[in-house]
Amino acid sequence: MNSMDRHIQQTNDRLQCIKQHLQNPANFHNAATELLDWCGDPRAFQRPFEQSLMGCLTVVSRVAAQQGFDLDLGYRLLAVCAANRDKFTPKSAALLSSWCEELGRLLLLRHQKSRQNDPPGKLPMQPPLSSMSSMKPTLSHSDGSFPYDSVPWQQNTNQPPGSLSVVTTVWGVTNTSQSQVLGNPMANANNPMNPGGNPMASGMSTSNPGINSPQFAGQQQQFSTKAGPAQPYIQPNMYGRPGYPGSGGFGASYPGGPSAPAGMGIPPHTRPPADFTQPAAAAAAAAVAAAAATATATATATVAALQETQNKDINQYGPVCSSFQMGPTQAYNSQFMNQPGPRGPASMGGSLNPAGMAAGMTPSGMSGPPMGMNQPRPPGISPFGTHGQRMPQQTYPGPRPQSLPIQSIKRPYPGEPNYGNQQYGPNSQFPTQPGQYPTPNPPRPLTSPNYPGQRMPSQPSTGQYPPPTVNMGQYYKPEQFNGQNNTFSSGSSYSSYSQGSVNRPPRPVPVANYPHSPVPGNPTPPMTPGSSIPPYLSPSQDVKPPFPPDIKPNMSALPPPPANHNDELRLTFPVRDGVVLEPFRLEHNLAVSNHVFHLRPTVHQTLMWRSDLELQFKCYHHEDRQMNTNWPASVQVSVNATPLTIERGDNKTSHKPLHLKHVCQPGRNTIQITVTACCCSHLFVLQLVHRPSVRSVLQGLLKKRLLPAEHCITKIKRNFSSVAASSGNTTLNGEDGVEQTAIKVSLKCPITFRRIQLPARGHDCKHVQCFDLESYLQLNCERGTWRCPVCNKTALLEGLEVDQYMWGILNAIQHSEFEEVTIDPTCSWRPVPIKSDLHIKDDPDGIPSKRFKTMSPSQMIMPNVMEMIAALGPGPSPYPLPPPPGGTSSNDYSSQGNNYQGHGNFDFPHGNPGGTSMNDFMHGPPQLSHPPDMPNNMAALEKPLSHPMQETMPHAGSSDQPHPSIQQGLHVPHPSSQAGPPLHHSGAPPPSQPPRQPPQAAPGNHPHSDLTFNPSSALEGQAGAQGASDMPEPSLDLLPELTNPDELLSYLDPPDLPSNSNDDLLSLFENN
């Protein structure tokens, strides 16, 4: 037996010993503390130790809540391990999630009971600070019987030579001075377990000669023998609480549910699903409660420091950090997040431990709440390492864990080839270890309720996940409801992004499927149609990239992501009276604060069903009248114990607001904000926003803002006359005209320089030149300036017009290479030969001249919008799910009985610029599911789901200047066109202002028209008392009773412009 094997065996023996001590109330604290310290080093989670470690954790999960044991310590221990669940087999990871959730729930209940009696500042269950001695992880125990009682647990410098602690055992004894101990296998710098000779163990106690002692050899027990391979750990519902949108984050956490290799089976002590009813949020809350008060400041500070280090080390230890970055698990983070307790989730101490730090803040380092907060862990994302794995995990040389698919990750990061499909994709690296998860106990497959078709990896692709009906666009996360076929394209790499959330309407957790990360290095095998659910299911739509803001994914490798990986680009408009928590400041020097708001079940359901509605939480500088999102670097946010990742981007203008609906639950919701530095200069606000997708807006504009060819011709003629009068022979385009008698118009979009697909311009623009409408909407999704790329005049969404005449020209020559056409005063046009073909121009038989003679308007066949809309598919709903290019039309929803009809594909006359066909845009059911990840300003019309796009326009735009024309179209939904419940978009919260009624409103076809936000009932309390629970808590209430479109007309405000908060677009129009 070589030294490494011996080391592994000794460590496993020690873990067996700890397992026994954990069953005894008298020794539980010491044993759990030692284990917690040991788990502070990511190497603790290497596969050779997994069975033994899981054996210990099984005991902890079973006894921690019993009398005489330490629930708080047990929870921390599980949380630290859960934070590293990506390093465990899927079965183990799922167990960890469920145990964590269960203990978190119990902790929360206990906290609630004691809350009335305990002063807020006191931590109900704070492990003794001595446990912080985690700085000295090695707790010695005597080798022999390891009687806990006889040997002091606190690091005993005089420990007997034979003493051996797990910490030393596993890590080998490298003490800070790096002195090595003879015979210590781990001390060897080249030791595989000790990467780079990194003295991870520094801080570990001095070496113990006993480390090699064979005496433990016999003690090792294989758990596997105890648990038959057939016993998957998880019980089906274990983690996803169906009722939970976020399901505590565990819900979707389990990707494919393939469970770990059978051999790992640890006895399934997991509690039946029923036990885990409380969402992770509760756990987090508990943790918060438990730890928040005392150590917050300390912890947060520590965490901040850790984070810094972590970010620095990240490259070095990528994976390690990543794990927490990823937001280790929700559970863990959140809890830790919450729990600033000294030990911080991952035993802060441990994290401080040099080794830990070196490790890039091992997850334990995470412990600091803030840390967790950072976690991008996408909101509903699975607790599992959210992609923490993303990092290549070079961290440990040891066997590379097969990381769980991180479902949480919403989008694969190119850089992580390792994880890419390794997960379970049908082709994943661990493809299907056949026996890996035998389906032996089907009943307990890890499938989380969400996963429709859960299939064990072993069945390669067949149906691993239900066949996606529609390919979701890569970015679109089709959250379909109910998992019914998640629409994911089967093969496209995009699908990886698609998050087909399999949402059940009520239950928001969309399981996003990330099939396999389409990482360049890791080619994603196309998923077979059957596996539409990619391995990474991410329960929440909004998941932010899991890594800390500073870590940038290798963008070049990603497909061009929409701003938010979540799916399609969306425009964002405040909804009238939609403020749930009025702008509030944090108390000075208050490290952790809780802000509560309520969602009525009906409101929650509506939010979940409508992809165009979102609860937006953002922070902005108090002097910024535009309320542009700006997050101070020290702010961390978690909702219902689910840490959210804040996307700060490269500069302060690229910060993005958080979208919370997928981590919310019916009833009481708690936003926990952790800061490490004063943020008094900033205000926080929670508001309902309407986030129509760019595609739905396109459809709406197409229906409502199409300028008939005859009007276009009139406008062109008028331009000719005005130009002739004012500028001689300069064309409106600013280019020299052939003469004053002809205008040369480019067929290329001035934004993308590609052929225009849907020509548009601002109502006030005087030029004939158009830009591509979709490209313009995408350009203005985030903090859009809404200025015409041709003349730079303001061209607000509601003032855009689609030029049918130009569209007809584009259609006429769609299959040719021409880049320009000349238009004469009679509006006859002809293509301009490409310069390379000029020689042909002189040739009477030249193709261009021959094939394209001047064409007069009367000869043109104008594109028929209705046909196009019809071609889009059945009842174009404003919420089409954009399928991946190629996606099929999704009628999924229709089958669901939702009001939404499937949207047909929206095919623009010539495919979309990006090559995507409109149908991509249109695609998809009305999707609530669109993950609303758009930047705030995306003004998409998509808003009403149920309504056909036409209505979408109503929201259109935000702007500072009114465009009368809009009235005609956008804002006032034509009857029948209004697509969704119009939310009154109005600027910030002017609850007082009654919504105006739109001139014409469509009679109600709004399936969800009830979305009107009723402040009075909704905001039952003032905005977020920081933690003041005695104050009425605000709640969001969407009035279902309103069905009259007139009443539901949506009002838009320029995105995020408080200045217009009291003016709805109609009023702007009136002023015009």
UniProtKB/Swiss-Prot annotation:
PANTHER family: ZINC FINGER MIZ DOMAIN-CONTAINING PROTEIN (PTHR10782), ZINC FINGER MIZ DOMAIN-CONTAINING PROTEIN 1 (PTHR10782:SF7). InterPro entries: Zmiz1_N (IPR040797), Znf_MIZ (IPR004181), Znf_RING/FYVE/PHD (IPR013083). Expressed in brain. Residues 844-1072 are annotated as: Transactivation domain. The C-terminal proline-rich domain possesses a significant intrinsic transcriptional activity. This activity is inhibited by the N-terminus in the full-length protein. The SP-RING-type domain mediates interaction with SMAD3 and SMAD4. There is a cross-link at residues 91, 841, 850 (Glycyl lysine isopeptide (Lys-Gly) (interchain with G-Cter in SUMO2)). Residues 128-141, 489-501, 1045-1072 have a biased composition (Low complexity). PROSITE patterns: ZF_SP_RING. This is Zinc finger MIZ domain-containing protein 1. Keywords: Activator, Cytoplasm, Isopeptide bond, Metal-binding, Nucleus, Transcription, Transcription regulation, Ubl conjugation, Zinc, Zinc-finger. Zn(2+) binds at residues 765, 767, 788, 791. GO terms for cellular component: cytoplasm; cytosol; nucleoplasm. Residues 112-141, 362-538, 875-1072 are annotated as: Disordered. It is found in: Nucleus, Nucleoplasm; Cytoplasm. Residues 437-446, 517-528, 875-886, 988-1001 have a biased composition (Pro residues). GO terms for biological process: androgen receptor signaling pathway; artery morphogenesis; cellular senescence; developmental growth; heart morphogenesis; in utero embryonic development; positive regulation of fibroblast proliferation; positive regulation of Notch signaling pathway. The keyword Metal-binding applies. Interacts with AR, but not with ESR1, NR3C1, PGR, THRB nor VDR. Interacts with NOTCH1 and RBPJ. Interacts with SMARCA4. Interacts (via SP-RING-type domain) with SMAD3 and SMAD4 (via MH2 domain). It holds the Pfam family Zmiz1_N. It comes from Mus musculus. Residues 1-120 are annotated as: Sufficient for transactivation activity. Its main location: nucleus. Acts as a transcriptional coactivator. Increases ligand-dependent transcriptional activity of AR and promotes AR sumoylation. The stimulation of AR activity is dependent upon sumoylation. Also functions as a transcriptional coactivator in the TGF-beta signaling pathway by increasing the activity of the SMAD3/SMAD4 transcriptional complex. Involved in transcriptional activation of a subset of NOTCH1 target genes including MYC. Involved in thymocyte and T cell development. Involved in the regulation of postmitotic positioning of pyramidal neurons in the developing cerebral cortex. The gene is Zmiz1. Residues 419-436, 888-902, 958-968 have a biased composition (Polar residues). Transmembrane segments: none annotated. The keyword Zinc applies.
